[in-house]
């Protein structure tokens, strides 16, 4: 679904922000990309979204190069940044109606309400202005937009940053629901616990390079923490009992 081949990005002659990334994310997979600030996570997402042009290599969506078929590839994608961009003076329902139409999906308002139900928002909440929503509720509207758009891949940049544990757990559950329906999920995060609990596979990025990937099934959080620290900070930490 999402494929990077020798994907690279250099800004203004500096060191590579992304250095020869090779990665494939399959339908139904939740891939969590871990790394410190400046590691290249957001650059990777921006390249798949065609927000920026690569310095080398290719980013493909469903086999299509995003730079060669930007309109075609965008219709398959939904994007949720750390702060979901919604119109504060419109209701949740009005926002969903607007962004669905923008993506070429037109619905009767009554047909949009089931999307709110799917993400755990009530009809009453759907009719409230976004200015009254918590961050967790706004993130849920972002998921509802992806559902209404019928996106086949969802890209997220630090989506649980600032959420309380309950809201984070609910959000992770929604991502797992999407993956069970065949949506490819690519989440950039620095939260090891959330990556382990949410992802089917995690990758570790450092200074623009993908230095390791691993399946999360059977992986203990303490093992992931140790591997991450060894790769990022070259800190040797002995395995601990849980």
Please give the residue ranges for each predicted region.
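A short, flexible loop at the N-terminus of ABC-type nucleotide-binding domains that lies
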Residues: 1-4, 8-20, 70
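Helix N-cap at the start of a conserved alpha-helix in ABC-type nucleotide-binding domains
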Residues: 165-167
């Amino acid at each position: 679904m999402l494929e990077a081949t020798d994907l690279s990005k250099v800004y203004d002659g500096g060191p590579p922000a992304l250095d020869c990334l090779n990665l494939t994310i399959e339908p139904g997979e939740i891939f969590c990309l871990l790394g410190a600030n400046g590691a290249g996570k957001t650059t990777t997402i921006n390249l798949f979204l065609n927000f920026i042009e690569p310095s080398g290599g290719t980013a493909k969506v469903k086999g299509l190069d995003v730079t060669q078929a930007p309109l075609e590839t965008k219709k398959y994608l939904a994007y949720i940044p750390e702060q979901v961009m919604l119109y504060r003076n419109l209701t949740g329902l009005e926002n969903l109606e607007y962004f669905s139409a923008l993506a070429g999906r037109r619905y009767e308002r009554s047909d949009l309400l089931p999307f709110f139900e799917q993400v755990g928002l009530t009809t009453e909440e759907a009719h409230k202005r976004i200015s009254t929503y918590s961050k967790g509720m706004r993130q849920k509207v972002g998921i509802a937009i992806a559902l209404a758009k019928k996106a086949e891949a969802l890209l997220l940049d630090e989506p649980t940053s600032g959420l309380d544990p309950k809201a984070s757990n609910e959000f992770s559950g929604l991502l797992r629901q999407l993956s069970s329906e065949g949506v490819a999920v690519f989440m950039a995060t620095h939260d090891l616990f959330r990556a382990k609990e949410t992802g089917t596979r995690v990758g570790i990025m450092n200074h623009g390079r993908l230095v390791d990937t691993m399946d999360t099934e059977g992986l203990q959080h303490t093992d992931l923490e140790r591997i991450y620290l060894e790769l990022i900070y070259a800190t040797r930490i002995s395995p601990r009992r849980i």
